């Protein structure tokens, strides 16, 4: 909070329970509520990424889900001021989202499955 040069923070959720997407969604909701309760609504925003991410209303096998899939469950804490500053440079914020979905569908699920599998295999040395 005191360092305004840090625009974003990634939080990796490593507990095995959170491999379940529904459990992860519970943690996401709790985290979002905590931000609100602590008075950070409008200051920070949570973006969510999970290996089994499925958008509400989307089919499990729709490639659009890969726009929010990651090798591991993550919470992405972002300063809203930075989002606002970036979005002022964009003509239409919705275009970004639509473009990402279109690109994901063009590349297809097998492409993203391969990328995520490669990333999971490439673990850092201990």
Language model segments and positions:
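Expand to "…catalyze enediolate/carbanion chemistry for C-C bond making/breaking, isomerization
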Residues: 1-126
């Amino acid at each position: 909070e005191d360092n305004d040069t840090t625009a974003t923070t990634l939080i990796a959720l490593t507990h095995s329970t959170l491999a379940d997407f529904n459990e992860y969604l519970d943690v996401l909701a709790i985290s979002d509520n905590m931000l609100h309760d602590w008075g950070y609504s409008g200051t920070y925003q949570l973006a969510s990424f999970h290996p089994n991410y499925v958008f509400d209303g989307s089919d499990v096998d729709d490639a659009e889900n890969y726009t929010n899939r990651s090798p591991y469950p993550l919470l992405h804490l972002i300063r809203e001021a930075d989002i606002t500053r970036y979005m002022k440079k964009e003509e239409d914020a919705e275009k970004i989202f639509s473009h990402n979905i279109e690109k994901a569908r063009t590349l297809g699920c097998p492409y993203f499955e391969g990328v995520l599998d490669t990333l999971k295999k490439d673990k850092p040395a201990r």
